[in-house]
Amino acid sequence: MIGIDLVDLNVAAVESNPFRKGYLDKVFSAEEQTLITNASKPHTMVWLLWSMKEAVYKIFSNEMNIRVFAPIDIQCSITDLSTESVKGNVCAYNEYYCTQTTISSSYMYSLAAKEKTELQYIKVKLYPYPSTFDYHATAPQSISHHGDYLALAY
């Protein structure tokens, strides 16, 4: 099973203020907040960690049939960081997952899987959103949309 989460960075910059009082404490662990504080682009780091958590949640919620999203209970760590790609590990309720995030100037998307080797086989297709075709007919394993983008993972 795989998960994907996409963030339209332009929309996120306009519609959300993750630095408002109390938000970081509700969503991110102390270690994650340190990553945010020390990042050269704190806003991007917030959405990176959020995207990792969401991608894993999509797997976890389907595997465990649990529909409660408590992002503070999903812990992220980064194992490899560059300007365009990030690899990480995520622990959700004592279940471990691997993530890989692709970052562009206008969006980012995170892929999640139980095994690191699974990530290399995931195919991602990006489309404008809202989409004019029936993407459900293509049978994606995971779907994410935000702002101007739709991401399908196969």
Model segments located where?
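Core catalytic alpha/beta fold that binds nucleotide/phospho-ligands
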Residues: 1-154
